[in-house]
Structure formats: C-alpha cells, structure tokens
Amino acid sequence: MERGMHLGAAAAGEDDLFLHKSLSASTSKRLEAAFRSTPPGMDLSLAPPPRERPASSSSSPLGCFEPADPEGAGLLLPPPGGGGGGSAGSGGGGGGGVGVPGLLVGSAGVGGDPSLSSLPAGAALCLKYGESASRGSVAESSGGEQSPDDDSDGRCELVLRAGVADPRASPGAGGGGAKAAEGCSNAHLHGGASVPPGGLGGGGGGGSSSGSSGGGGGSGSGSGGSSSSSSSSSKKSKEQKALRLNINARERRRMHDLNDALDELRAVIPYAHSPSVRKLSKIATLLLAKNYILMQAQALEEMRRLVAYLNQGQAISAASLPSSAAAAAAAAALHPALGAYEQAAGYPFSAGLPPAASCPEKCALFNSVSSSLCKQCTEKP
C-alpha cells in the first residue's frame, strides 16, 4: 500500500516536471519570437521607473511564481490601441494580446495561449533565473562586468540587438547596449517587476555606465582643448617677451646717444666742466646751454649797434670836411685794399678827422652811443 502511494507520488512528480518543462519550452519559444522583433508602437525609453519591491521578494528564488502587485503598477501595459501591434510582434498571438519584449500578457492568456492563462503575471516576466537578480542589477548599474550564467541561451543578446536597431530608443539605452551585453544574463526580472527605462535587463545600468564613459571622453577632450589653449598662450607670451626686449634695447641705445650728446655740450659750455662744479644733470645742462646762447646773442647784437653808430659818425665827419674827404677818397683810390680793410674793421677814427681834435669833441660827436669808449672822457676833469 505504501509502495503504491510512493509510486503514485513519483508518477505525479514526473508529470509535474514534464508539465513544467513543456510550459518552459513553449514560453521560451514565444519569448524568443517576441525578442527577435521590437513592436513599432512600443518605446521602452519613455517607460516610468520601476516600483521598488521588498527585499524579501526580490531575493527569494520563488519570486517568479509570486502573484503580481495587486495595484498592477509593476506591469507596463500600453494603451488598448496597441493590442494589434502586440499580437503582430508576438507572431500572430491572441487578438487582444500585448507584445512586449519580456512581457506577454493578453486577454486570452499569457502570450496569447489560453493554456497559460492560469499562470500569474509574474511568471510571464520571469526568465527562470536564480536569486542573483538583485546582485546582477546592482553590479550592472555600477558598470561591473559579470560572467554569463550557465543557462543563458542568448536571448538577451537578441533583445539588445533589437533595442539598438530601434531608432526611437533613447540615447542612453542605445549607448548602454554594448556595455549591458556583457552581463545581461545576470540582470533579471522577477514577478511583478517592470521594465527599466533604459531597456530590458541591464539596459538602464548600461546606459548609466555608458553615460559615465561618455562624460570621461568629454573631460578628455576638454583637457585636450586646455592643452592647446595653454600652448597658444605660451607662444603669445614668448612673442610679447621678444617684442618687449627689442623695445627695451632700442630705448637703451637712444639714452646712450643722448648721454653722449649732453657730455659733449657740457665740455663746450663755460663753467660746466670746472673742478669745483659737479657734473650737471640733463635739465641743468640744457638750461645752462640756453642761457649761454642767449648771452652770446645779446653780445653780438650790441656789437652790431656799436659798429653801425661808428659808421654813421664817420659819414657825418666826412661831409663836414670835403677836403679831407677828397683826400680820403684819393687815398682809397690809390690803395683800395687799405680802404676795404678800414671799412671792414669799422675803426671809428678815420684819417679824415683832424689830428688835433680833443676827447670831448669826439664824445660829443658820438653822444648817442652808450659805450665804454667814452669812459676816458667822463673820468677826466
């Protein structure tokens, strides 16, 4: 009796195992058919963030067979108008079915199969992976590489290829496809969990890792730009330094020439090179040179006036004494060189004047000239 019960229990266990294998095979075929083509009306990049489930359900190996959320927030169901696209994407399933990669839920059952209508919604989302889902998701979001599981059949690669080929996919999900393909089989979905915004499996994590790598590339290009700007600034600084050196050398030569000229001027000006006077400054040298030039000009002007007045007196005396003038003219005709010399010298007392003329008469003759020539007349009594 007990042996019969054991045999019956064993037969029932074998039937359950066979039923489980057949269900798994049919589900995997339909999931693979759904993975091969992404429905045109479904954009996974715009999906809302997943609801966080308790840690007990995410770490439990039986999370695949737990019932879905009572509120239905864990399932991403498109609007009713997308039923036709879902059935077309799932290979001609039920009319009211919804075809989503990794999510096959319809009015006629899971994946349009009425025989699978008894399974909960979480079983359709589970891909028969173990309790390493939470660890794989965390590792993938952090950018770490994970080794594929033994029971991985390459379906995740098909999903990633379809996601990359979709032109409506977000840039984060598309960029993270290559990174997420390495450890995609470890990022799994449990019952009632929704699809991440970046795509199925580790798409969101891949997007973040690719975004971080893209940020690194941007920083690298920024460093390259800063290096080029620093090189250009160094070239400009070198050019400015060379120009400044040339200007300084030119000004130094000019100052040397000016100092030499001032030294020559000090050597010519009186009292500027005496031992009792120290070397004059530039401004003092120029002022002294100006005063010296003005003094010389005044002395020359006084000499011209004196010579003019003496010549005028000589002409008056010659007119008063015609005999003497005639004698002077005859003498000039006989000796023209002597007459020219006398006129050039401007001697005030010519030969035409009487030799017996006294000093007061001479001073009276040149009374308009204030000169030192008549001092002897005024000093004498």
From Swiss-Prot:
Region described as Disordered: 30-94, 135-154, 188-242
Tissue specificity comment: Brain-specific, with the highest expression in the cerebellum.
Gene Ontology annotations for the cellular component aspect, listed alphabetically: chromatin; nucleus
Entry keywords, A to Z: Neurogenesis, Nucleus, Repressor, Transcription, Transcription regulation
Gene3D superfamilies documented for this protein: Helix-loop-helix DNA-binding domain (4.10.280.10)
Keyword Iron-sulfur applies: no
A GO molecular-function descriptor: sequence-specific double-stranded DNA binding
Compartments where found: Nucleus
BP-aspect Gene Ontology terms: axon development; positive regulation of transcription by RNA polymerase II; sensory organ development
Organism superkingdom: Eukaryota
A Pfam family: HLH
InterPro entries: bHLH_dom, bHLH_transcription_factors, HLH_DNA-bd_sf
Chief localisation class: nucleus
Chain ranges of the bHLH domain: 242-296
Feature: compositional bias, Gly residues: 82-94, 198-225
Functional note: Inhibits DNA binding of TCF3/E47 homodimers and TCF3 (E47)/NEUROD1 heterodimers and acts as a strong repressor of Neurod1 and Myod-responsive genes, probably by heterodimerization with class a basic helix-loop-helix factors. Despite the presence of an intact basic domain, does not bind to DNA. In the brain, may function as an area-specific transcription factor that regulates the postmitotic acquisition of area identities and elucidate the genetic hierarchy between progenitors and postmitotic neurons driving neocortical arealization.
Subunit annotation: Interacts with PRDM8.
Name under which the protein is recorded: Class E basic helix-loop-helix protein 22
Gene: BHLHE22
